[in-house]
Curated annotation (Swiss-Prot):
Transmembrane segments: none annotated. It comes from the Bacteria. InterPro entries: CinA, CinA-like_C, CinA_C, CinA_KH, Competence-induced_CinA, MoaB/Mog-like_dom_sf, MoaB/Mog_dom. This is Putative competence-damage inducible protein. Belongs to the CinA family. The gene is cinA. PANTHER family: NICOTINAMIDE-NUCLEOTIDE AMIDOHYDROLASE PNCC, NMN AMIDOHYDROLASE-LIKE PROTEIN YFAY. HAMAP family: CinA_B.
Length: 416
């Protein structure tokens, strides 16, 4: 049969309806299916109730020919997705030997006792293509029944994502009769808004065919996912590189890395490569910048130390900010930011000193509204200060400040 093109995703789990977790699986699956030309028209969420799940399945069957389920494949009594679908299709559940062996091996390896309920996880709908689970116990499956496909996937994203990418997607492409190689890369940008990036690349995005270009903004950053497909993998790579070059020619000044990297990871790499050390004086960020830097192994090679300087006493007595500066300009000022950066650099003997002073909110301070911040940098005997007006929550402003700190030092290192 021709592979269906009208897909629906059904997320199963009462925790979704209670707002305890977000349905990130549907977003992920939709993106993955779009890359291979399968259109998702509906997202549905339903609780752990077999009767309501049956109702949702009947509705989906009236409007979709490819139904994907996530969740409800576990060993507990409320994990009923598999049983409900098998009952709806009139198919028995059978034991999958490979899955059962994998579960047994896991319990032997961890020296735990396997309960009878765990056997349930190795059951699959008869006649299904089984999707191996290398990061959990319950296998997934793809079942064809009366001109429709039903795909069952585990709920935990740490299991669902690798299963879909490594097992489900290749199987779907095979069912579709495609020998095309699909390759994606993500370009990461900071310091430019999504609307401005899209405006700068409007003609490229409007004309996209192969590769496709998917913008996404989150946490003050913008990413572009480029996805190309071709029977020849080298040609796929060429298509990606060609489009990437055109994009970076226009907005390359805001580009900082690929795929799953981050600003702080790129900063750590750059500092280690150049033998540069950093120190930080943090007021409104409250040590967040220092925490991020020390989250990575080998941080002692690049991070000399940090001071959380919330009070003016610490700014003066530890970091050497002049009393006259605080009296005349206040703690939230470019003058204070400059002296803080210089002071922490001198205190630690680092190559670069960075300071963060401002108002994280929710209340105004010294006549400054929340989000009004200054970031100072001291390096090579010079100080520079950058002023920003951020919007958002207290946590969001702190994160935005710490990210801009990484961004500014990266730009400084590019000049070296």
């Amino acid at each position: 049969m021709e592979f269906p093109k009208k897909a629906e995703i059904i997320a199963v789990g009462s925790e979704l309806l209670l707002g305890q977790i977000a349905n990130t699986n549907a977003q992920f699956i939709s993106k993955q299916l779009a890359e291979i030309g399968v259109n998702v028209f509906y997202h549905t969420a339903v609780g752990d109730n077999p009767e309501r799940l049956k109702q949702v399945i009947r509705i989906a069957e009236e409007r979709s020919d490819f139904i994907i389920f996530s969740g409800g494949l576990g060993p507990t009594k409320d994990d009923l997705t598999k049983e409900t679908i098998a009952n709806t299709l009139g198919r028995p559940l059978v034991l999958n030997d490979e899955a059962f062996q994998s579960i047994e091996d896991y319990f032997k390896r961890t020296k735990r006792t396997m309960s009878p309920n765990n056997r349930k996880q190795a059951l699959v709908i008869e006649g299904s293509d089984v999707l191996a689970n290398h990061f959990g116990m319950a296998p997934g499956m793809l079942t064809e029944h009366e001109s429709r496909y039903y795909m069952l996937l585990p709920g935990p994203p740490s299991e669902l994502r690798p299963m879909f990418e490594n097992e489900a997607k290749p199987l779907l492409l095979k069912k579709m009769g495609s020998n095309e190689k699909i390759v994606s890369t993500v370009l990461r940008f900071f310091g430019i808004g999504e609307s401005q990036l899209e405006a700068d690349l409007e003609d490229i995005i409007d004309a996209q065919t192969n590769p496709t270009i998917a913008p996404l903004a989150a946490d003050g950053e913008v990413t572009l996912r480029l996805t190309a497909k071709h029977a020849d993998e080298k040609e796929t790579e060429r298509l990606l590189k060609e489009t990437e070059a055109v994009i970076l020619e226009r907005v390359g000044e805001f580009f900082y890395g690929y795929d799953d990297t981050s600003l702080v990871k790129e900063l750590s790499i750059a500092c280690k490569e150049k033998g540069i050390t950093i120190s930080a004086a943090e007021s409104f960020t409250g040590g967040l910048f220092s925490e991020w830097l020390t989250d990575h192994s080998g941080a002692s090679k690049l991070f000399a130390g940090g001071v959380v300087c919330y009070t003016n006493d610490v700014k003066q007595n530890v970091l050497g900010v002049k009393k006259e500066t605080l009296d005349r300009f206040g703690a939230v000022s470019k003058e204070c930011a400059s002296e803080l950066a210089k002071g922490v650099q001198k205190l630690t003997g680092s190559d670069i000193g960075i300071s963060f002073t401002g108002v994280a909110g929710p209340d105004a301070q010294e006549g400054h509204e929340p989000g009004h911040v200054f970031i100072g940098i001291s390096a090579n005997g010079k100080e520079e200060v950058h002023e920003f007006h951020f919007a958002g929550s207290r946590t969001g402003i702190r994160k935005r400040g710490a990210k801009y700190g990484c961004h500014l030092i990266l730009k400084l290192l590019e000049q070296k």
